[in-house]
Curated annotation (Swiss-Prot):
Subcellular location: Cytoplasm
HAMAP family per record: Exonuc_7_S
Pfam families, sorted: Exonuc_VII_S
Keyword RNA-binding attributed: no
Protein name: Exodeoxyribonuclease 7 small subunit
The EC number(s) this enzyme carries: 3.1.11.6
UniProt xrefs under InterPro entries: Exonuc_VII_S, Exonuc_VII_ssu_sf
Superkingdom of this protein's organism: Bacteria
Name of the top EC class for this enzyme: hydrolase
Gene Ontology CC: one annotated term: cytosol
Assembly and oligomerization: Heterooligomer composed of large and small subunits.
């Protein structure tokens, strides 16, 4: 995947595009493997964003206020890839 930075929403949209492309087109093996690798990277990134959001929600539900934790998502969907 390119070195450009993506928000969660951008990464998810690209992941959906990659999946459609792999499902609906006949690609050469090398190109299909490249897309598959990009999809795996995007999937891991999106999963990480969701896990961090879940941590924030759990903290808010437990304490009623948000506390800083190392590595936590700091601002909504501003996390970038």
């Amino acid at each position: 995947m390119k070195a450009e930075k993506k928000t969660f929403e951008e990464a998810l949209a690209r992941l959906e595009q990659v999946v459609r492309e792999l499902e609906l087109t006949q690609l050469p093996l090398d190109q299909a493997l490249e897309l598959f690798a990009e999809g795996i990277t995007l999937s891991k990134y999106c999963n990480s964003c969701l896990e961090q959001a879940e941590q924030k929600i759990s903290m808010l539900m437990a304490d009623g206020e948000l506390k800083d934790i190392p590595g936590a998502l700091s601002g909504g969907s501003s996390r970038e890839l």
